[in-house]
Amino acid sequence: MVIKAKSPAGFAEKYIIESIWNGRFPPGSILPAERELSELIGVTRTTLREVLQRLARDGWLTIQHGKPTKVNQFMETSGLHILDTLMTLDAENATSIVEDLLAARTNISPIFMRYAFKLNKESAERIMINVIESCEALVNAPSWDAFIAASPYAEKIQQHVKEDSEKDELKRQEILIAKTFNFYDYMLFQRLAFHSGNQIYGLIFNGLKKLYDRVGSYYFSNPQARELAMEFYRQLLAVCQSGEREHLPQVIRQYGIASGHIWNQMKMTLPSNFTEDDC
């Protein structure tokens, strides 16, 4: 297998995960002893130990003192964060994972948004107004750099929106605009989820963040997708302000259908790095 990684720990993690996925260390099997495995991968035992602990926390492995490390049935023991990893392992099924994400968001949003609009109306309105104004400023700015220079939240945005090594300035601007728009889209859903009064909804979005960023950074490279999303945000705000929460399911469902149509077009020309791991 060909593995690209930025650090020995990253290499070891990818090696073990890909070995589990490809059947070299199948679910239910026992991993080689620590010394043997560290020599096989080419990392120190200290590095390997740290990686094994992290993989155990993520549900890939079971580590018990005095017993061999066991490979789990990871689809039964892992959380939502595994979805982004599955994108990198199973590129052929990447689009179905995206569609599952979009469908799940459409299904749960009417529930938590209804509670957010009822229990924390003013906070919900502030979030949506902030997102709408920020997204309008972003798409109307002459460039991403100009938007950042004028934004009072520039430092926070740059903590979350990372630049890559794109040399073409036009492509760089397009990439950063898409990533920043996705930053606001995620903010709207995640914060409304927490304002529902049920922290589980917010934690669901936390668990999906890496996958959400991967998908949104591509999806929102489409100006049509950005315009559709902003109109959706405005409709949500209108529902919240009017108190007519019974309209939420229809508004969200219509957006889910329309955004699904855009995705169905975009998935035909996925970029080569769409399923690449960034670790």
Swiss-Prot record:
PANTHER family per the UniProt record, alphabetical: FATTY ACID METABOLISM REGULATOR PROTEIN, TRANSCRIPTIONAL REGULATOR, GNTR FAMILY
Known function: Multifunctional regulator of fatty acid metabolism.
GO MF terms held by the record: DNA binding; DNA-binding transcription factor activity; fatty-acyl-CoA binding
Single GO BP term: regulation of fatty acid metabolic process
DNA-binding region(s) from the entry: 34-53
HAMAP family xref list: HTH_FadR
Subunit structure comment from the entry: Homodimer.
GO-annotated cellular components: cytoplasm
Keywords annotated in UniProt: Activator, Cytoplasm, DNA-binding, Fatty acid metabolism, Lipid metabolism, Repressor, Transcription, Transcription regulation
Protein name (record): Fatty acid metabolism regulator protein
Residue ranges of every copy of the HTH gntR-type domain listed in the record: 6-74
Lineage, highest ranks first: Bacteria, Pseudomonadati, Pseudomonadota, Gammaproteobacteria, Vibrionales
Protein localization: Cytoplasm
InterPro entries: FA-response_TF_FadR, FadR_C, TF_FadR/GntR_C, Tscrpt_reg_HTH_GntR, WH-like_DNA-bd_sf, WH_DNA-bd_sf
